[in-house]
Amino acid sequence: MSNIGFIGVGLMGSAMAHRLIDKGHTLTVLGNRARDQIDALVGRGATEAPNASALAQSSEIVMLCVGTSDQVESRMRGDDGVLAGLNADTVVIDFGTSLPGSTKALAAEVAQAGGHFLDAPLGRTPAHAVDGLLNIMCAGDEGAYNKVLPVLKDVGENIFHLGDSGSGHTVKLINNFFGMTVANAMCEAFAMACLLYTSPSPRDS
C-alpha cells in the first residue's frame, strides 16, 4: 500500500480519495474552506496537511484533481507548494484537464527536483470512481507510470499510457472537442427538424 497525498477533494476527487482508503492506502489530504469532504476523509483515517509542501513531504505519490492549470500550478509552486516539499522519486499525478504546455513545464520542474510528473486526465463520473471504474489517459515517464500502475488500477478500469508528457492532456482535450462537436451537431439537427417538420406529432392527433 502507498502513502498518497491528495489535493482537490471535490466531487471527483473525494470519490477517488474514498476509493483509495477503501483499497488500504494511507492518505494525506490538503485542507480547504469546504470542510464536508475533508472532515469525512479525516474521519476515515486520512491526515490533513496544512499546505501542499507538508503534504508532499509525507507522500510517495501526490495526486491533484483540480479544475484548471492555474490551480495546478498554484499548488505546485511557491514556498508552500508541492515542489518545495517533494521527496526524491515521488510521482506527481495530475488528474485534471490541464493545458499540455503547462503540463510539460511542470514535468520539467518536477524532474529537476528529483521526481516524476504524470498527466492522467479522467473519463467517466464520480459514481464510477467510487467503484474503481474510471478511464485514465496517462502520459509521462514510463517507469514512473509502471510504478504507480497498481494504484491507478485501484481507481481505474481502462488505463492507457499515451506517450510523452502532455500527451494525456492532449488526448483528453481532443476527446472533449469531439464530444462538444457531436453535441453541437445534434442541436443544429434538432433545430432544423423543428423548423422543417410540419406534420402534427402523435400527441396532437
Stretches found by the model and what they are:
Residues 1-57, 61-64:
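NAD(P)+-binding Rossmann beta1-loop-alpha1 motif at the extreme N-terminus of oxidoreductases
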Residues 4, 97-177:
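Rossmann-fold dinucleotide-binding core
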Residues 38, 59, 69, 79, ...:
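A general structural signal for well-ordered alpha-helical segments in protein cores
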Residues 52-56, 61-62, 69-134:
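Rossmann-like NAD(P)(H) cofactor-binding subdomain of soluble oxidoreductases
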Residues 189:
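Cationic-aromatic interfacial patches
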Residues 197-205:
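Single conserved hydrophobic/aromatic residue that forms the stacking wall/gate
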